[in-house]
């Protein structure tokens, strides 16, 4: 397959072609996140609390898979742009091997540690039981998640975005269908409650992997994963982790933030923990589609950067910025005007709806300005500048928001914690813009 279309095709139709499949798949994934939570919420509010508490660990596992996949994607795209097909194959093969290793370690570690982790945030026996039941099943599929993300990023690196889209949608749709069947025991399916929700998730992930394997072997691509490429290459492996670790941290930092917020707010009322969990489900409807556009941008930036087309890289970045800005503006308007309805989808508790509605209106004030941070972070990853991307995420998820949340909570009460979000977005966006401007002005030709 000839990937030169990435530096020859007009930018708007090119980015649209690359991004649209990922936006669609991310929207379906967002729908799954919402529907999955809605079904769990129908079990009980304790079940919803358990899901909210397990979410940071799930998010960390996904962060390792996606973040390391970003490293694989960036290196493959760069070497294809530089006409170094052999190195692209080595990057894909080494990435696949390390991803499986990550999956084994995370499966064992997460199952062993989840009871202790949950007990730090709640003493409610029902919440603990539901959380452990869910986690013990869903974490078994960590290896499959790692393999899925490797194939997804390999397909994306050669412009086969439709394959990624179909694979993601297949898993999400299967999950949506299986959720009510396995949770509530409809028809001949057993009533499994939280275990059913976890099993539905795992089956969906397995179906995605099966599809990727069929696509890889039936319609070969220019990048190959093979044992013959499993050769010692310390420089390449260091580059994989040099890009992958910052990307992993970028994605894992929200887990630390959520855990911090849960610990801070649980001392006041359980409804605040539920609100944080609901918000992070709702915001996927904005940030996942925006991430879909960024996924379409990233291989284009990497390929053109490797080919020395710096002006084209700038145009791709600025167009992505505008497209994500439209998504965030729409999201801000919807969340501000319909917050009671959105929170009410997950709970009928009047206190939770009131607290959640107020929180959502406050947080959404930072959506539009966050466009700069998320787009710059994704572009820097595509440019193999993982360290600078990590700086943006550290500011956004740790260095600004955690001190702000703590001070606001202690000074004005838990309801004021949510102001830390929009203040953080403004501060981070200013620094992200400067980092991106510097990177585009001073391109690094080494990889």
How should these model regions be labeled?
Residues 8, 12-31, 35, 57-64, ...:
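Residue-level signal for short hydrophobic patches within transmembrane helices
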Residues 17-36, 137, 171, 204-208, ...:
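Transmembrane helical elements of multi-pass membrane transporters/channels
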Residues 27, 31-49, 118-125, 181-192, ...:
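Helix-terminus/linker motif at the lipid-water interface of multi-pass membrane proteins
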Residues 48-108, 145-164, 262, 275-339, ...:
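Small-residue-rich hydrophobic transmembrane alpha-helices
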Residues 60-63, 107, 175-180, 209-213, ...:
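Hydrophobic transmembrane alpha-helices of multi-pass small-molecule transporters
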Residues 69, 73, 138-156, 164-172, ...:
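Short runs within selected transmembrane alpha-helices of multi-pass transporters and secretion channels
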Residues 110, 153, 179, 183, ...:
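Structural signal for membrane-spanning alpha-helices in multi-pass inner-membrane proteins
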């Amino acid at each position: 397959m000839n990937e030169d279309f990435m530096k020859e095709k007009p930018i708007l139709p090119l980015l649209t072609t690359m991004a649209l499949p990922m936006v669609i798949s991310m929207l379906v994934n967002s729908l799954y996140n919402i529907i999955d939570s809605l079904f769990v919420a129908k079990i009980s509010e304790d079940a919803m609390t358990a899901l909210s508490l397990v979410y940071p660990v799930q998010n960390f596992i996904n962060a390792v898979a996606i973040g390391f996949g970003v490293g694989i994607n960036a290196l493959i795209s760069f070497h294809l742009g530089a006409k170094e097909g052999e190195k692209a194959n080595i990057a894909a093969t080494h990435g696949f091997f390390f991803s499986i290793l990550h999956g084994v370690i995370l499966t064992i570690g997460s199952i062993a540690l989840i009871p202790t982790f949950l007990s730090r945030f709640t003493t409610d026996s029902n919440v603990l039981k539901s959380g452990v039941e869910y986690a013990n099943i869903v974490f078994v599929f960590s290896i499959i998640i790692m393999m899925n993300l490797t194939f997804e990023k390999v397909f994306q690196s050669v412009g086969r975005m439709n394959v990624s889209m179909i694979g993601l949608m297949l898993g999400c749709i299967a999950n949506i269908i299986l959720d009510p069947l396995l949770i509530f025991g409809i028809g001949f399916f057993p009533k499994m409650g939280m275990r059913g929700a976890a099993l539905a998730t795992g089956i969906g992930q397995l179906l995605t992997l099966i599809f990727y394997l069929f696509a890889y072997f039936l319609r070969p691509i220019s990048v190959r994963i093979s044992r013959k490429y499993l050769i010692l290459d310390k420089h390449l492996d260091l580059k994989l982790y040099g890009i992958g670790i910052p990307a992993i941290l970028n994605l894992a930092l929200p887990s630390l933030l959520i855990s911090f917020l849960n610990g801070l707010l649980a001392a006041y009322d359980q409804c605040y923990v539920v609100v944080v969990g609901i918000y992070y489900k709702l915001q996927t409807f904005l940030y996942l589609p925006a991430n879909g556009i960024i996924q379409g941008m990233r291989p284009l930036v990497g390929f053109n950067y490797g080919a020395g087309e710096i002006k084209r890289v700038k145009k791709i970045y600025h167009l992505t910025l505008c497209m994500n800005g439209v998504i965030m503006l729409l999201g801000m308007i919807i969340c501000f005007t319909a917050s009671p309805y959105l929170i009410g989808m997950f709970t009928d508790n009047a206190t939770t709806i009131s607290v959640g509605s107020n929180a959502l209106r406050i947080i959404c004030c930072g959506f539009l300005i966050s466009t700069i941070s998320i787009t710059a972070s994704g572009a820097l990853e595509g440019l193999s500048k993982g360290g600078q991307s990590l700086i943006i995420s550290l500011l956004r998820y740790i260095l600004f928001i955690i001190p702000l949340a703590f001070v606001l909570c202690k000074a004005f009460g838990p309801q004021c914690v949510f102001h830390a979000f929009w203040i953080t977005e403004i501060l981070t966006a200013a620094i992200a813009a400067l980092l991106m401007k510097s990177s585009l002005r001073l391109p690094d030709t080494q990889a």
